[in-house]
Amino acid sequence: VVRRAIVTPDKHFPIHDKKAIKIVCKAIEIVKPDIYIDLGDTGEWEHFSSHYWKGRSAKPMEDLIPLLNKDVKDVNKGMDMIDESLDKVNCKERHFVQGNHEVWLDKFVIRYPYLEQYKTENALKIEKRGYEYHPYNRKKLLKIGKLNFTHGKFVSKYHSFKHLDVYGESIMYGHTHDLQRHTKTHAGGTISAWSLG
């Protein structure tokens, strides 16, 4: 049985490419996928990032919370656009693969366990949206048929070769913000790694 899927990496809401997201939404409505896979880094999550706070004074929690809430609101607004298109075509199978930017949320909650609402699954309403959640780069990846999906782990010059070499099976990933492919043929058949950007 052939099923159609749309896979999107690294949207980084709210600093996303607005035209690209409109095209993704239109593609969903034209293709009518059976499966949608979000490969993570859906949000930029600026105020959760240690990069943002490096060299800056820590803000008191009452000043920080509004910034965090704005990040959550902005990223959910972006996901809402995609979900609206998925709802129009009745796409029921939805997967969310956590990216390294979403890991920042979970690390924040480890530091402040009383702010559980900022965990990735909670902040993005993963269950309510109908997504199956896949934590960041676990050994057991999302696998559909013979194809594995992960956010991405390696960023070297030949990252698609590295992903294929390490995982040893066909794999699709994002993380690198560029396109790359590597294919290997052996006695067991052909396997490939695709970086979607």
Residue spans for each PLM region:
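Mobile, glycine- and charge-enriched loop segments
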Residues: 1-18
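Active-site-proximal segments of metal-dependent phosphoesterases and phosphodiesterases across multiple
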Residues: 61-66, 108-168
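Alpha-helical hydrophobic/aromatic positions enriched in membrane-embedded helices and signal peptides
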Residues: 2, 33, 91, 143, ...
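Active-site metal-binding loops of divalent metal-dependent hydrolases
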Residues: 9-12, 40-44, 100-102, 152-154, ...
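Conserved beta-sheet core of the metallophosphoesterase superfamily
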Residues: 146-197
